[in-house]
Curated annotation (Swiss-Prot):
It comes from the Eukaryota. It comes from Carcinus maenas. This is Carcinustatin-14. The lineage of its organism: Eukaryota, Metazoa, Ecdysozoa, Arthropoda, Crustacea. GO terms for biological process: neuropeptide signaling pathway. Its main location: secreted. Keywords: Amidation, Neuropeptide, Secreted. Signal peptide: none annotated.
Amino acid sequence: YSFGL
């Protein structure tokens, strides 16, 4: 899982 803005 990865999250980036």
